[in-house]
């Protein structure tokens, strides 16, 4: 799917059509499209249309700055859904690469048990 088609579907609010098209795409391609979208609002709309599992996979393929923007803009529940789909080591990597002002939101979104594991992994050399 071309970036222009995505932009057109968002602008015309054809979200059902867009959601169906995204279903057939792989996560790496969706990540590239999100990186190419200039409009932050469009990125959020497209990301929110993804099923939970695909959103997690797409998130793991994104550039660090795009992930940071999404973390800031997603609700706590949405962020929890995305983080639940990541492998624990990916969550640790995410925490290590994010600025210190973003980390508390990530930690708040993961379960208490997962937070303990993350803390242990962060201590591991």
Q: What function would you assign to each model-found segment?
A:
Residues 1-125:
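Hydrophobic packing positions in regular secondary-structure scaffolds
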């Amino acid at each position: 799917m071309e970036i222009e088609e995505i932009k057109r579907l968002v602008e015309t609010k054809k979200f059902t059509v867009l959601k169906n098209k995204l279903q057939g795409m792989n996560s790496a391609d969706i990540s590239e499209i999100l990186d190419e979208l200039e409009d932050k609002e469009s990125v959020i709309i497209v990301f929110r249309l993804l099923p939970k599992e695909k959103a997690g996979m797409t998130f793991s393929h994104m550039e660090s700055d795009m992930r940071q923007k999404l973390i800031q803009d997603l609700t706590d529940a949405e962020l929890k859904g995305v983080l639940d789909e990541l492998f624990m080591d990916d969550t640790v990597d995410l925490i290590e690469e994010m600025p210190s002002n973003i980390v508390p939101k990530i930690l708040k979104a993961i379960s208490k048990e997962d937070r303990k594991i993350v803390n242990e992994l962060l201590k591991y050399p």
